[in-house]
């Protein structure tokens, strides 16, 4: 069994006190300790330090209890500490301090700016607390190795666990299994994925807008799950009755067969075009690194063409960008592309900013239905103020190479249509003897076990997971991560003859970036908007990004984006010589004939 939460809370308390001491020294250097004491009516510096250390220790205990200890994850401990410090900055200086002095919090940009020194200190406190926590528990484990559960040898063949899918759900399942069965020889786990990397999909719009490099948001699966066998292969057949799957390791290579005792389906989803061939042929999706890179290069290529275009109709089509779907993905990608194009216009002297046109098509009357009505309206207003057009209550009916046709017959001339209006579960699921919902996802019970099958589990986008009220849980990375952890725990519990646990999860926060350093967020039911929401969005996603190296690279990309224009280098767009220049035979070379 994993170490107790109490132990981690105790070491977190010690680490918090250490981090708090360093923060106290920094605050005292600026003469701010007396302000802390003044919050409860005291004046001495000593009182301020004592109060500060007490709060820091309590916060540290919360860190240890919340994030727990996992060997080999010092980078995650630091990044979790950074986001934890950011949260305490919001709770403390931005919220509780104004309340205690009778002013009330405003969460304004001016208030956040005035508290910038406190922000820096809290981030350093969180990072050092995370590092201290990891170092303390690691040292304790080395000094007292008997606190770890001894290795358990199998009485017979090990239980074979096959996880199909290397996205958030599949990797979360694998990582949790590594923690639960690292010393247990009764289990043998294998992760199978067509890609050898975990893609951080929430950041794909920033790759498409040239704000981040593609490789910076992808982490090698072998690095994320170092103690699990990994197979880079596609699965083209699953035999549920005989507990085996057929693998295709690569083009031209022979098929392989693999047997399992427990199967985890984390196959994700694919774009769903509602049966329209025209959408399949003429729109851009945003599900993979290749999709994001292709869209980026296309946008830059049409800017290059528009800068030399003499036909006003063609130029209008080239400079019109349409996004279909007003959820998180559609809203974020249109905001990011707006920032990209307007931020690089100085490179294109023959394109005027007023010629750029951005249109979002959404079938409902409000965008971002996951947010509260107030934040949804705020987001709509902010994007409209920037010049983005919205056609709400409209549906796309067809697409061509130079236009999008709506259900009311309206035709929008454009060379760029981005589809975020719907996904469907992986088509492989339709070959299984399982009940599927309307979007092709497998129905599972409350334990995330496929209905009617005791040894097959499903999660993430390919599973129909219902909340206690019978409504489907949102298809988000947060839910996939939680589901992956629970599936791992339930598999181990089932093998051990224990009762599996039902899935219950309430998201701590919802975040959306609106471009131009603006965002909207709901954290524990509390709405945030503007610059503070944008900071929260970036802080959360940075903390969730796997691997310290990737976190540092993304952080530097963000910093550079504040100072420099975005990169406009085309990396894969073919040079269309026939479209831009006449052939040699058609040209007239005076004096050579």
Q: Can you describe what each PLM-predicted range is?
A:
Residues 1-151:
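Juxtamembrane/disordered regions of integral membrane proteins
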Residues 153-237, 321-322, 328-371, 418, ...:
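Beta1-alpha1 glycine-rich phosphate/pyrophosphate-binding loop at the start
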Residues 155-158, 230-322, 418:
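FAD-binding core/adjacent interface of flavoenzyme oxidoreductases
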Residues 163-164, 258-268, 396, 404, ...:
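Short hydrophobic core segments
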Residues 228-247, 251, 338-446, 450-452, ...:
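A Rossmann-like FAD-binding core segment of flavoenzymes
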Residues 281-311, 402-405, 411-416, 420-482:
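FAD-site-proximal beta/loop scaffold in flavoenzymes
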Residues 314-371, 378, 389-391, 474-493, ...:
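Rossmann-like dinucleotide-binding core of oxidoreductases
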Residues 483, 488-593:
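C-terminal, flexible cofactor-proximal segment of oxidoreductases
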């Amino acid at each position: 069994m994993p170490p107790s939460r109490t132990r981690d809370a105790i070491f977190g308390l010690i680490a918090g006190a250490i981090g708090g001491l360093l923060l106290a020294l920094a605050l005292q250097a600026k003469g701010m300790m007396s302000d802390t004491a003044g919050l409860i009516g005291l004046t001495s510096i000593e009182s301020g330090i004592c109060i500060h250390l007490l709060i820091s220790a309590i916060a540290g205990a919360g860190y240890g209890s919340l994030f727990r200890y996992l060997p080999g994850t010092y980078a995650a401990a630091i990044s979790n500490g950074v986001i934890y410090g950011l949260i305490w900055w919001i709770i403390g200086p931005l919220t509780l301090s104004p309340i205690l002095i009778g002013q009330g919090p405003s969460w304004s940009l001016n208030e956040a700016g005035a508290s910038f020194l406190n922000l820096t200190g809290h981030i350093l406190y969180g990072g050092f607390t995370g590092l201290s926590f990891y170092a303390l528990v690691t040292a304790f484990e080395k000094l007292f190795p008997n606190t770890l559960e001894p290795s358990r040898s199998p009485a017979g063949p090990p239980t074979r666990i096959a996880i199909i899918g290397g996205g958030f759900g599949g990797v979360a399942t694998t990582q949790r299994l590594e923690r639960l069965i690292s010393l247990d020889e009764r289990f043998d786990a294998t992760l199978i994925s067509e890609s050898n990397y975990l893609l951080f999909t929430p950041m794909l719009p920033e790759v498409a807008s040239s704000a981040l490099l593609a490789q910076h948001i992808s982490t090698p699966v072998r690095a994320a799950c170092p103690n699990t066998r990994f197979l880079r292969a596609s699965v083209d057949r699953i035999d549920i009755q005989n507990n085996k799957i057929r693998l295709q390791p690569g083009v031209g290579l022979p098929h392989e067969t693999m047997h399992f005792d427990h199967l985890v389906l984390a196959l994700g989803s694919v774009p769903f075009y509602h049966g329209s061939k025209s959408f399949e042929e003429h729109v851009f999706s945003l599900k993979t690194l290749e999709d994001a890179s292709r869209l980026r290069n296309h946008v830059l290529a049409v800017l290059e063409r528009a800068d030399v275009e003499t036909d006003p109709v063609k130029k209008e089509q080239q400079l019109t960008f349409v996004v279909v779907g007003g959820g998180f993905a559609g809203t974020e990608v249109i905001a990011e592309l707006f920032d990209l194009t307007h931020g690089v216009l100085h490179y294109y002297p023959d394109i005027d900013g007023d010629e750029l046109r951005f249109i979002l098509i959404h079938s409902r009357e409000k965008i971002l239905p996951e947010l509260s009505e107030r934040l949804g309206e705020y987001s709509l207003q902010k994007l409209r103020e920037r010049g983005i057009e919205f056609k709400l209550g409209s549906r796309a009916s067809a697409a061509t190479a130079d236009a999008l046709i709506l259900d009311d017959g309206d035709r929008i001339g454009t060379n760029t249509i981005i589809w975020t209006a719907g996904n469907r579960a992986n088509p492989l699921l339709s070959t299984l003897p399982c009940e599927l919902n309307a979007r092709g996802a497998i129905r599972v019970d409350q334990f995330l076990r496929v209905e009617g099958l005791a040894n097959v589990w499903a999660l993430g986008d390919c599973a129909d997971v219902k909340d206690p009220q019978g409504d489907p849980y949102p298809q988000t990375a947060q839910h996939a991560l939680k589901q992956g952890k629970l599936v791992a725990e339930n598999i181990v519990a089932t093998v051990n003859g224990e009762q599996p646990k039902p899935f219950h999860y309430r998201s701590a926060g919802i975040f959306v970036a609106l471009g131009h350093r603006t965002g909207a967020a709901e954290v524990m039911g509390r709405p945030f908007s503007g610059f503070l929401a944008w900071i929260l969005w970036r802080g959360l996603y940075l903390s969730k990004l796997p691997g310290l190296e990737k976190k540092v690279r993304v952080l530097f990309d963000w910093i550079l984006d504040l100072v420099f224009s975005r990169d406009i280098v085309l990396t894969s767009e073919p040079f269309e010589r026939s479209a831009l220049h006449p052939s040699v035979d058609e040209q007239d070379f005076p004096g050579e004939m």
